[in-house]
Regions:
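Structured, charged N-terminal subsegments at the starts of enzyme catalytic cores
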Residues: 171-254
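Long, non-catalytic protein-protein interaction scaffolds
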Residues: 1-182
């Protein structure tokens, strides 16, 4: 097994990320809470641990509606969190170590820098990609991403999941809950089914949060812009529980 070097570029950035709306202190608090919940959920199932952690970052990390937006859903990604692809945060429970070090430089208090150091040490042993690399890297054939000294990059195609878009759009959130509950009756309850229901309920909490942001954005806008925001708000209300009926609603849902 090759010793993993976690310092350096870990992800492919497909676009330049906007600076977080949260202050450095707010970001630090969110990442600490995520780390705490992840640590305290160690003895739980992976499903329960995941939903516990997701509740820390959602809907907290969703951004305000901007003037040009026609859909709600802008989202911040911090150096520590949960993701589905390497280009946005990371895969699974992640820590982007180089970004965490850059974030550390934004903090002026030594006490705050030490808080970052503690998280860094924890995620060295818990970041999904770091754990994966420890298992698959070799001394001379398999390197980590990005390492051109090796013929094979272990994490070049590492990704977390792909949505079943037809099932999502054909059933809607409440429809998906019904499908899961039907499976529970046939197969019996388990942690996966329970966490799946909780994740759909969390989605609905996010929609409620987004509607608040949209309604806040309606203050002091032109009549034309108000119509756009009203459609956004109405579509969010629909997809909170029903399957989308228009293309715009489908876009908003996913």
């Amino acid at each position: 097994m090759k010793k993993t070097n976690i310092v350096g570029a870990q992800n492919v950035e497909v676009s330049i990320k906007l600076p977080s709306e949260k202050t450095p202190q707010e970001q630090l608090a969110i990442m600490e809470e995520y780390t705490r919940v992840h640590k305290e959920s160690k003895g739980l199932s992976k499903e329960k641990r995941e939903i516990n952690c997701l509740k820390v970052i959602y809907p907290t990390l969703f951004r305000s509606i901007e003037e040009q937006d026609l859909l709600a859903g802008r989202l911040d990604f911090l150096p520590i969190g949960f993701g589905c692809v390497t280009s946005l945060g990371g895969v699974g429970h992640y820590c982007v170590f180089d970004k965490l070090l850059k974030f550390r430089e934004e903090l002026s208090l030594v006490e705050d820098q030490k808080r970052v150091d503690e998280m860094y040490s924890y995620w060295e042993e818990n970041d999904v990609k770091a754990l994966y690399c420890k298992d698959v890297l070799t001394e001379d054939t398999v390197g980590r991403f990005i390492d051109c000294d090796f013929p094979l990059m272990a994490t070049a195609r590492l990704s977390g999941m792909m949505l079943d878009y037809p099932k999502l759009l054909d059933n809607g959130i409440e429809g998906l809950k019904t499908l899961i509950k039907e499976k529970q009756v046939v197969l019996g309850d388990n942690e996966f089914f329970t966490a799946s229901i909780e994740s759909l309920e969390l989605y609905q909490q996010v929609v409620d949060f987004e509607r608040e942001l949209v309604q806040k954005a309606m203050l002091q806008v032109s009549p034309e812009r108000r119509k756009q925001l009203e459609m956004m708000d109405n579509d969010l209300e629909v997809v909170r529980s029903q399957k989308p009926r228009t293309f715009h609603q489908a876009l908003q849902m996913v």
